[in-house]
Amino acid sequence: MEKFQGYLEFDGARQQSFLYPLFFREYIYVLAYDHGLNRLNRNRSILFENVDYEKKYSSLIVKRLILRMYEQNRLIIPTKDLNQNYFFGHTSLFYYQMISVLFAVIVEISFSLRLGSSFEGKQLKKSYNSQSIHSIFPFLEDELSHFNYVLDVVIPYPIHLEILVQTLRYRVKDASSLHFFRFCLYEYCNWKDFSIKKKSILNPRFFLFLYNSHVCEYESIFFFLRKRSSHLRSTSYEVLFERILFYGKIQHFLKVFVKNFPAILGLLKDPLIHYVRYHGRCILATKDTPLLMNKWKYYFVNLWQCYFSVWFQSQKVTINQLSKDNLEFLGYLSSLRLNPLVVRSQMLENSYLIDNVRIKLDSKIPISSIIGSLAKDKFCNVLGHPISKAVWTDSSDSDILNRFVRISRNISHYYSGSSKKKNLYRIKYILRLCCVKTLARKHKSTVRAFLKRLGSGLLEEFLTGEDQVLSLIFPRSYYASKRLYRVRIWYLDILYLNDLVNHE
């Protein structure tokens, strides 16, 4: 982050007060389109289409845009002329796209610098890669086994543009930047009413910035969750992009609420609270009673409706009892499972059998929703019976095989932490048989005849890749005993949800 701070050329006091002049500096555009900062779009190409301006960027275009920004009237273009009005060879929409990227980057760096300073003096938990989605589950396994209720909250989106502008006012004191931000935001809403190509939409970085600033303001309300907490934060610069938040055990904050929030002190009798937020949802785990959990629920509803002026239905907050209900989180179904243990104790000539029960977090694959996603993509029918992928029959055999193998390995990689591998093997079976049926359909043959001609070597492609990786991680004796197939493995290189999870 130190290297980004040099680009701003401001000290801490001026940094939040004078952001508008940065729109007229060429080196900021270089930073915005730098390979490192633009990594997000390439990594998430499966979700967002690359827009044209990434390929057309040049210093000449930047100079033309800055020249146009000095003349304010030239930025205001009627919406009907948005794609027809050209300025130095580019449409007005193209320049608005560049401005949206620049605005997001400038404010992101400013936010991140202040966010980093807010962690000073805090106790940071060590983690090899806290950006990984799988790093959440070991945390939940260690902590949720001690709790009985979880509050599952779907974070609402603001329905009015002024709410976003108002949220940004708390953090950006530069009036010129706020007016410019409001202008670009309203211009974009005018474009949505007209026929504009999907790839011409504003940069996803801009919308991620809007969403994260909204969530950041919401989480700042719960300062008591951060007053005396330990943080596990991301290790890279993309701290504002869907940042994983971990708040550990909260203690010694009752005095704060006696002074500031005496009316809701009854909600906070239990000082042990865990909060996790990722991908538009958050969970709050406590040891509270059902009555107090309902109070938490309506507190969330009133918070959004009264403080943030967002219509928020109570159905968006669900109370899950972990011993009875399944918690659907990040593509897994999690619940508490009682694991009985019998321990024999020998004392002199007498022996005793001691029954012990260990509570364990059980994470399973939601097989019905995964099969529904596979059926929607035409890999199988709604009952889970594999069918041929007709749209891929025009590709080469190697291309078809590589596609299926890649999908199978990605699913195995993401759901390697499942406690029941039977459902995972069923999904892999569907993909393997779908691959064979697709190849047989291409060659106008039956599945039996096609497999007889090629042998079993075709299906081994689905197994070798994952087995080779696991054989390097675990010792040979452990791998040979086949106990590996019953062990849950959490990988620390998974940064995004699997496509089948995102399908809904």
UniProtKB/Swiss-Prot annotation:
GO terms for cellular component: chloroplast. Pfam families: Intron_maturas2, MatK_N. The keyword Ribonucleoprotein does not apply. Belongs to the intron maturase 2 family. MatK subfamily. This is Maturase K. One of its GO terms (molecular function) is RNA binding. It comes from the Eukaryota. The keyword Plastid applies. Its main location: plastid. One of its GO terms (biological process) is mRNA processing. It is found in: Plastid, Chloroplast. It comes from Barbarea verna. Coiled coil: none annotated. PANTHER family: MATURASE K (PTHR34811:SF1). Usually encoded in the trnK tRNA gene intron. Probably assists in splicing its own and other chloroplast group II introns. Keywords: Chloroplast, mRNA processing, Plastid, RNA-binding, tRNA processing.
